[in-house]
């Protein structure tokens, strides 16, 4: 059999540890998106940098291979909902970390009002109460594609889940 592949970090730490502006921006993002650790921000930032670097190399090169890579990258970004159809490669350079954070499963559950807070959405996901299609997802950082977005649903009828959904339906009945 083959050797086990060594796991690598999926992020890199900031180059300078004590930048006040960056630390404050990270704290705000932690609160806004209900994140537990700063490395979740750094992972998302690394993914964004990969997209940006690929876009820069594609723009610089004018080969048939770069055209193929351009089409593949744009299709992936369309499917993730980060770009709209008809966008160009140059539009990839305008993406921000907040665009990626808005496509996380945890954020979409709150936006669809299946949970009241980001932390409650995170709890639902880690306790296997959320499914996308027929598959339970246990990672709050799962990037949901546009096709999967309408298929997000709660699975387990926990007391907390029932209470949250009952409150939601009571609000709808009153209005």
Over which residues does each language-model region extend?
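Ferredoxin-like alpha/beta domains used as RNA- or RNAP-binding modules
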Residues: 1-112, 124, 131, 135-175
């Amino acid at each position: 059999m083959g050797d086990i592949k060594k796991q690598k970090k999926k992020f890199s730490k900031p180059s300078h540890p004590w930048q006040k502006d960056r630390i404050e921006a990270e704290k705000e993002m932690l609160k806004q998106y209900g994140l537990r650790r700063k490395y979740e921000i750094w992972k998302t930032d690394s993914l964004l940098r990969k997209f940006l670097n690929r876009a820069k190399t594609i723009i610089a090169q004018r080969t048939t291979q770069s055209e193929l890579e351009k089409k593949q990258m744009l299709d992936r970004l369309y499917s993730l909902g980060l770009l709209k159809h008809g966008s160009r490669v140059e539009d990839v350079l305008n993406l921000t970390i907040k665009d990626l954070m808005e496509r996380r499963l945890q954020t979409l559950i709150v936006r669809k009002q299946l949970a009241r807070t980001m932390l409650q959405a995170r709890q639902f996901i880690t306790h296997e109460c959320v499914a996308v299609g027929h598959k339970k997802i246990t990672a709050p950082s799962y990037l949901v594609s546009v096709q999967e977005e309408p298929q997000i649903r709660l699975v387990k009828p926990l007391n907390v889940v029932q209470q949250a959904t009952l409150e939601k339906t009571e609000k709808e009945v009153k209005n």
